[in-house]
C-alpha cells in the first residue's frame, strides 16, 4: 500500500475537479437530473470538434500503417480500456477485418471487462510488457487511452511502443499543461469536470467512445471498406447481416431481392465482390483478383475494369 503521506494529489486535474453545475446533484428530481446530463453532454461534441485535426491525423497515419501490414492497438485501463476493447470487437463484423488487425488491450485482461480491477492500472511494467507479448513493431499503431492522463499502465505501454518505433497516440481528457506526454499524436478531449466528480465513465467516456468511433470508421473508409456510406465489407454472419447485405445490393444495383440473393451466393457472400461482379460481368475469383490489385478499393476496381 502506498504511504498516504507521499501520495500526490490529483485534485488539479480537469477530470477530478468539482463541476459547479452539479453541486446539488443529490437534491435533483429524476427529470432535473436527466436535463442536467443532457445539458452537460453538449461538452462532448465541442471536445470532439476541438480535437478534429488530431483525430484526422490519427486516421491518416493509422491507415498508412495498416496498408503496410501493421495493426492498431487500443490500450487502457478501466472505462478507457473497455471502450477500446468494445471498438476493436466491432471491427470484424462491421468491416470483415481479421481479429488481429484491431486489438483492444485492457489492464487486467478479459476478467476486467465485467469486474473492475482498478489496482492493475498502477502497474507500469504490465503495460510495458504488452508490447513484447503482442509482438508490437514499428509497423503498428498504439493508442494509449487515459481519461485523467496519468495511468501508469498506459504510460508503460506507450514508452515501450516508442522503444520499438511504433506510431504512438495519446488520448486524454486533461489539458497538456496538466499532463504532458510524448507521442506522435496527442488527442485531448476536454469535456470539463464530471457531474459526479471524478467519474470519468461519464462525459470523458462518452467523448472517448465518440473519438474511437471516428478513428476506426475513418481508417476503414481509407482502407476501402466502405462504398458511399455502405459497409460493403460486412461479415455476413447472421440473419440481420444477411438482410443488410441483400439490401445493400438491391439499393446500389436496383436488382430485386431474389436476384441479389443469387448474386450474393455466387460471390461467396462478399458484398463488395458481388457488386464488382454485377458491374463488370467478372466471376468471383476474377473480381477478387481485381479488388486485390486495387487494394480493396471498389471505386478503383470498377474504373480499372470498365475504363482500362
Curated annotation (Swiss-Prot):
Keyword line: Carbohydrate metabolism, Lyase
UniProt organism field: Thermosynechococcus vestitus (strain NIES-2133 / IAM M-273 / BP-1)
Active site positions: 90, 121
Catalytic reaction list: N-acetyl-D-muramate 6-phosphate + H2O = N-acetyl-D-glucosamine 6-phosphate + (R)-lactate
EC number: 4.2.1.126
Role this protein plays: Specifically catalyzes the cleavage of the D-lactyl ether substituent of MurNAc 6-phosphate, producing GlcNAc 6-phosphate and D-lactate.
InterPro entries, per database record: Etherase_MurQ, Glucokinase_regulatory_CS, MURQ/GCKR, SIS_dom, SIS_dom_sf
Miscellaneous comment text of the record: A lyase-type mechanism (elimination/hydration) is suggested for the cleavage of the lactyl ether bond of MurNAc 6-phosphate, with the formation of an alpha,beta-unsaturated aldehyde intermediate with (E)-stereochemistry, followed by the syn addition of water to give product.
SUPFAM superfamilies on file: SIS domain
Similarity section: Belongs to the GCKR-like family. MurNAc-6-P etherase subfamily.
Alphabetized HAMAP family for the sequence: MurQ
NCBIfam families xref list: N-acetylmuramic acid 6-phosphate etherase, PRK05441.1, PRK12570.1
Gene name as annotated: murQ
Key word Signal present: no
The name this protein goes by in its record: N-acetylmuramic acid 6-phosphate etherase
Quaternary structure, from the entry: Homodimer.
GO molecular function, one term: carbon-oxygen lyase activity
Pathway, per record: Amino-sugar metabolism; N-acetylmuramate degradation
Gene Ontology biological process terms, A to Z: amino sugar catabolic process; N-acetylmuramic acid catabolic process; peptidoglycan turnover
Amino acid at each position: 500500500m502506498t504511504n498516504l503521506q507521499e501520495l500526490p494529489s490529483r485534485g488539479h486535474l480537469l477530470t477530478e475537479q468539482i463541476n459547479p453545475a452539479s453541486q446539488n446533484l443529490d437534491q435533483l428530481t429524476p427529470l432535473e437530473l436527466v436535463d442536467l446530463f443532457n445539458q452537460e453532454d453538449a461538452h462532448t461534441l465541442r471536445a470532439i470538434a476541438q480535437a478534429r485535426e488530431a483525430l484526422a491525423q490519427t486516421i491518416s497515419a493509422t491507415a498508412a500503417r495498416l496498408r503496410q501490414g501493421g495493426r492498431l492497438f487500443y490500450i487502457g485501463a478501466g472505462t478507457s480500456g473497455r471502450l477500446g476493447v468494445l471498438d476493436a470487437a466491432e471491427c470484424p463484423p462491421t468491416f470483415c477485418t481479421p481479429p488481429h488487425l484491431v486489438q483492444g488491450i485492457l489492464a487486467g485482461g478479459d476478467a476486467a471487462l465485467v469486474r473492475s480491477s482498478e489496482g492493475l492500472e498502477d502497474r507500469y511494467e504490465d503495460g510495458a510488457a504488452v508490447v513484447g507479448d503482442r509482438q508490437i513493431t514499428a509497423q503498428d499503431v498504439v493508442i494509449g487511452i487515459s481519461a485523467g492522463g496519468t495511468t501508469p499502465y498506459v504510460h508503460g505501454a506507450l514508452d515501450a511502443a516508442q522503444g520499438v518505433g511504433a506510431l504512438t497516440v495519446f488520448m486524454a481528457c486533461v489539458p497538456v499543461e496538466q499532463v504532458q506526454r510524448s507521442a506522435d499524436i496527442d488527442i485531448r478531449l476536454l469535456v470539463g469536470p464530471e457531474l459526479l466528480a471524478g467519474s470519468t465513465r461519464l462525459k470523458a467516456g462518452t467523448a472517448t467512445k465518440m473519438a474511437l468511433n471516428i478513428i476506426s470508421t475513418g481508417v476503414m473508409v481509407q482502407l476501402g471498406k466502405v462504398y458511399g456510406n455502405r459497409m460493403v465489407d460486412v461479415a455476413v454472419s447472421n440473419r440481420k447481416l444477411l438482410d443488410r447485405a441483400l439490401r445493400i445490393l438491391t439499393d446500389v444495383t436496383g436488382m430485386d431481392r431474389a436476384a441479389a440473393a443469387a448474386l450474393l451466393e455466387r460471390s461467396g457472400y462478399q458484398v463488395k465482390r458481388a457488386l464488382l461482379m454485377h458491374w463488370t460481368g467478372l466471376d468471383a475469383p476474377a473480381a477478387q483478383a481485381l479488388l486485390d490489385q486495387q487494394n480493396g478499393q471498389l471505386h478503383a476496381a470498377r474504373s480499372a475494369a470498365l475504363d482500362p
